[in-house]
């Protein structure tokens, strides 16, 4: 930790309080706990959590932290799954200040909605809601949006998503602060919007919503991953279509993982797909889905909107352990989910201090709550679950609906398996069930924490030309597992593989064995959850981090790199 004296820290904290107000500064460890603890795992100490209320306040807080030689950890929704939004242990060489951007949730629609300007606390849900009346959509819909994830958090971690045509979150237009080689804080405006010259002019103009159409330039820089549709169609490529450390997708704020303080990003929006249709496909032979994927990507004129895979085992786990999530979204809508996740986080933090309550009390309570309701999945889905091991949820739109239906009818005249055309309710519930799967494994581990060691969650991208996508583990690894849960974005070849580990197994050693197998298969990991503190960043990604943050003052240690100032290694 920092050698700064208690007196110096007191003066520093007084300065932060002066900048944002006492009510927007937390120093009590009990009150900062939910900001210091990760969504799934990871935690550490922090000197303070500060909540600036304007971009200009954020700039002044950053300057104060740089002057006082503090580590800066930018945090929005804290929904990351790989510990990248929180401190990691207590072996840092300086004090940590967490800057929460939740109050900075403005959104500016550019033109007729073709582009937007998102601020540090803008959520995917608020963006989706603002665009809906305009017939537009953001990069990502139902998924991260349901738990209150931020738009800029997605950009900084080039997060993925289920929408085949949109690729990972990406932009080349952003406004960010960088600590340069001399330890000086600088503001860089690459938004392509005329905002003035000084930080005060630039940030005040954004804070006061004084952007005019004439200020916005269109100079050819990209505000989404424009090339993704070509990459995902290349079924002979020996590389994945997308993964976090792809050097071609690292650009300033995009992929910076907190190594820059991002004030705003400019993003493209997408025309909402009309006349959508879900086809529910089942088979007992993985090669059938391989053929479907390869044919659609190589030959269909219309790319799918989405193509989601679920194995029977995760279908079952999600049916039982994702039921309350399913019902809440189905009955209350996605707009209530951030509130419930926030409430759960606060309740967990409070109950942790009460000895009377067992760990994971809220998870156990919500699990019991779900049992009170009748079966929630449509009969035809249940029938397909009984008949088939592998499930593909194929969503098409426009002319793609007829194209897919015609081809699937012909294909299943000779292929093992079958499909049915979903009613609107079946299609909605099928995708909602797939969404619930993402949290079901975590719920299982929480409810059965006395019986299982942990959950090992891997997030992988396979080579586009890989035909052996379905994993077969060697017996010495398989014997250490209670459940193997496979689901993912099948057209993109991005899989989430959650392993429930038997009690007493060394999870860290098991993970290393798993990653070695993935390396042998030519897979890249992580695919869309980013390295956080759980994965080692490849050298190209480490180089990108060092370029963005030469003094290693912003989110140090990310990707298992040095936590020390100026990237010094521990002797």
Predicted regions: what is each one?
Residues 274-306, 313, 320-368, 378-411:
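A conserved active-site cap/scaffold subdomain adjacent to cofactor or substrate pockets
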Residues 51, 81-105, 161-184, 259:
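Structural signature of FAD isoalloxazine-binding scaffolds in flavoprotein oxidoreductases
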Residues 25-29, 51-52, 72-76, 83, ...:
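General beta-strand structural signal in soluble alpha/beta enzymes
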Residues 3-5, 20, 39-41, 47, ...:
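Conserved glycine-rich FAD pyrophosphate-binding loop
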Residues 1-28:
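A charged N-terminal "starter" segment
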Residues 132-287:
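FAD-binding subdomain of flavoenzyme oxidoreductases
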Residues 89-98, 103-104, 109-151:
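Anion-binding (especially nucleotide phosphate/pyrophosphate-binding) glycine-rich loop
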Residues 30-32, 36-104, 118, 138-139:
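Glycine-rich N-terminal segment of FAD-binding domains in flavoprotein oxidoreductases
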């Amino acid at each position: 930790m920092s050698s700064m004296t208690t007196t110096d820290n007191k003066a520093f904290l007084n300065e932060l309080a002066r900048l944002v107000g006492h009510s927007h500064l937390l120093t009590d460890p009990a009150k900062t706990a939910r900001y210091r603890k990760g969504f799934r795992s990871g935690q550490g100490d922090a000197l303070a959590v500060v909540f600036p209320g304007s971009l200009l306040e954020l700039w002044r807080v950053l300057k104060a932290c740089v002057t006082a030689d503090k580590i800066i950890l930018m945090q929005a929704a804290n929904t990351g799954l790989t510990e990248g939004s929180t401190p990691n242990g207590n072996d840092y060489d300086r004090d940590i200040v967490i800057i929460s951007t939740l109050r900075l949730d403005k959104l500016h629609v550019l033109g007729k909605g073709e582009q937007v300007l998102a601020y540090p606390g803008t959520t995917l849900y608020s963006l989706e809601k603002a665009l809906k009346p305009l017939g537009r959509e953001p990069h990502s819909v139902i998924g991260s949006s349901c738990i209150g994830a931020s738009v800029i958090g997605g950009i900084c971690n080039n997060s993925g998503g289920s929408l085949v045509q949109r690729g990972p979150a990406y932009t080349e237009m952003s406004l960010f602060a960088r600590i340069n080689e001399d330890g000086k804080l600088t503001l860089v405006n690459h938004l392509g919007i005329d905002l003035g010259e000084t930080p005060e002019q630039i940030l005040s103009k954004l804070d006061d919503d004084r952007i005019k159409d004439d200020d916005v330039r269109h100079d050819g820089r990209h505000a989404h991953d424009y090339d993704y549709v070509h990459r995902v169609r290349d079924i002979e490529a020996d590389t994945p279509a997308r993964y976090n450390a792809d050097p071609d997708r690292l650009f300033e704020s995009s992929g910076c993982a907190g190594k820059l303080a991002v004030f705003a990003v400019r993003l493209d929006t997408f025309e909402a797909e009309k006349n959508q249709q879900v086809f529910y496909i089942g088979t007992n032979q993985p090669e059938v889905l391989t053929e479907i994927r390869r044919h659609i990507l190589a030959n269909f004129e219309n790319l799918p909107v989405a193509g989601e895979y679920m194995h029977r085992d995760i279908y079952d786990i999600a049916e039982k352990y994702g039921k309350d999530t399913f019902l809440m979204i189905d009955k209350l809508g996605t707009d209530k989910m951030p509130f419930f996740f926030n409430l759960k986080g606060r309740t967990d933090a409070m109950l942790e201090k009460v000895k009377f309550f067992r760990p994971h009390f809220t998870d156990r309570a919500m699990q019991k709550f779900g049992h009170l309701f009748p079966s929630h999945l449509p009969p035809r889905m249940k029938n397909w679950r009984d008949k088939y091991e592998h499930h593909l949820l194929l969503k098409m739109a426009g002319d793609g609906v007829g194209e897919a239906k015609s081809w699937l009818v012909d294909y299943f005249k000779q292929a093992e398996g079958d499909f049915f055309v979903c009613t609107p309710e079946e299609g909605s519930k099928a995708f909602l069930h797939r969404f619930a799967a993402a949290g079901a494994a975590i719920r299982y581990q929480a409810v059965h924490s006395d019986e299982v060691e942990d959950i090992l969650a891997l997030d992988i991208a396979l080579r586009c030309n890989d035909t052996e996508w379905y994993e077969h583990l060697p017996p010495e690894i398989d014997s250490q597992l209670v459940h193997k849960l496979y689901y993912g974005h099948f057209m993109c070849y991005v899989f989430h593989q959650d392993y429930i580990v038997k009690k007493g197994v060394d999870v860290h050693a098991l993970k290393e064995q798993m990653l070695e197998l993935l390396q042998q298969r030519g897979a890249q990991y992580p695919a869309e959850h980013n390295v956080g503190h759980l994965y080692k960043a490849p050298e190209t990604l480490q180089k990108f981090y060092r370029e963005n943050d030469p003094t290693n003052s912003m989110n140090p240690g990310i990707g298992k790199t040095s936590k020390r100032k100026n990237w010094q290694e521990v002797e």
